[in-house]
């Protein structure tokens, strides 16, 4: 994470925080998948200003991409997940997330038994147009 936080973020707000939950530390947290060895919850500041909110969210996902690339170097698999319970204030309180923050994503962490085959990316030239 120390390297992943070198993500671009406007005005250096660094809007992220992290909660690490290991497989053996999930008592009362039945909403996590038991087959996933660990989870990293990435939270971000709630902003009433839509511009700041979008900037913060973009910065958080730049950080997540950095983390995924760095983890892959160590053969650690990272799956970015979104769950209904992320938006449940009761769950957030149970996880100790303050009212002024929200969960941006849950990273499911583990080592692959088999390396998944890479899927081909779509052709970028089909996704843009010239005005």
Located regions from the model:
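Acidic, surface-exposed loops and disordered segments
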Residues: 1-131
């Amino acid at each position: 994470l120390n390297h992943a936080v070198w993500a671009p973020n406007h005005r250096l707000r660094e809007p992220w925080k992290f909660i690490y939950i290991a497989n053996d530390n999930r008592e009362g947290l039945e909403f996590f998948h038991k087959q996933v060895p660990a989870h990293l919850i990435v939270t971000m500041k709630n902003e009433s200003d839509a511009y700041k909110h979008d900037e913060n969210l973009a910065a958080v996902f730049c950080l997540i991409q950095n983390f995924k690339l760095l983890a892959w170097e160590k053969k650690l698999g990272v799956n970015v997940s979104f769950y209904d319970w992320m938006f449940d204030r009761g769950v957030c309180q149970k996880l100790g997330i303050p009212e002024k923050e929200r969960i941006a994503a849950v990273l499911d962490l583990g080592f692959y038994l088999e390396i998944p085959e890479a899927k081909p990316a779509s052709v970028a030239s089909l996704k843009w147009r010239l005005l």
